[in-house]
Amino acid sequence: EDVIIINSAPNKKLRWEKTQSVNAGFDFSVLNQAINLSVDYYYRKGTDLIALRMLPLETGFTSMNVNWASMENKGVEISLSTRNITTKNFSWYTNFNFAYNGNKVLQENIPEQQTTPGREGYPVGAIFALKTAGVNKETGNMMFYNPEGEKVTLKELYRLKDEWGIGIASSDVTAAEERTFYSYIGSSDAPYTGGLINTFSYKNWELNVNFSLTFGGYVRTQPSYDIINPDYGKNYNADVLNRWTPENPNAELPAFMLSASNPEEYSWYDSKTIWRDLDIWVKKLNYVRLQNLRLGYRIPELLTKRLGMNSATVSIEGRNLFVFGSGYNNYMDPESMYNPYATPVPKSVTFSLNLNF
């Protein structure tokens, strides 16, 4: 039988969202434009954003889309270009740009039954995680910090009980209380980005070196292995070698868990997203990428004229050749850490010949 389910109440009074913005900046140039500096500041506040608003249960609905949420964005963008050296046969130019971009959710509603914190007061890309306290060297189980800062087991944190003795855990922890178990780690949107381009010219040769910079962001990675029901025929991240075993009691990652040895925690890991919510899977996103490296040679005009051409240039170019960073060990690229199956940023080397007649 066909049925229609209405998940949220309709709202015919929805209207356009509002934005207030302020921009300021200045440009600075000295030494016959050998040094050029540009600084821009912006502030944007969005109000009447469409978001869910919880409703009294007597309305028959739990939530409705309403114009009521708000968010602010602010940042500074700096651009600096310099003419470092210019002689008859050699020149060196530099372009540097840097930006800080931050945002904050000012008003947001979350369902009462939601067990993870809301983003109000935090960035849109806020990452919250359960604060771990290392691995118990005797049992191999993960330890946690409770809201009071005490080291506890998962069973103690959630007050787990197997009331029927059948290996299914229950807890009297409320959703509001569970939200206090989580700590704010950072934002998935890196607040600091930039780029550095150096161009060197010597006679007919030209070398371009382009770096991109990303700092201050975080990424929630997929767990390196399954703590319960591990598939021994599956390819895992090399981090699995750093899990607890009797021969490796000082490991940083917990042991595989068996239902017979710890039925309450096993059941809780199995029925919840606790394992993926641990802070050990949140990595810093700080890296510098050699985005472009190009070496070109302009064939002398005397030769091109003899060949019936106006100009000719030969070059070799490499893209995304190197990444310098921390926190992405055992991952192919920091930009694809969130998904072990994602295609990393490709590296390429190309050769080109440009002829103009």
Predicted segments, located by residue:
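Active/binding-pocket-proximal capping segment
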Residues: 42-47, 56-58, 213-217, 224-228
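Active-site-adjacent bridging/hinge elements
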Residues: 1-3, 50-54, 75, 167-176, ...
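Glycine-rich, aromatic-lined ligand/substrate-binding cores of catalytic
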Residues: 185-222
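Flexible glycine/proline-enriched surface loops and loop-helix/loop-strand junctions
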Residues: 6-8, 179, 191
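Extracellular/periplasmic, surface-exposed regions of secreted and cell-surface proteins
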Residues: 1-129, 277-357
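Extracytoplasmic gating/loop element in the C-terminal half of outer-membrane beta-barrel translocons
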Residues: 215-313, 318
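Conserved small-residue
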Residues: 66, 76, 83-187, 228, ...
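N-terminal hydrophobic signal/anchor transmembrane helix of membrane proteins
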Residues: 34-38, 76, 192, 216, ...
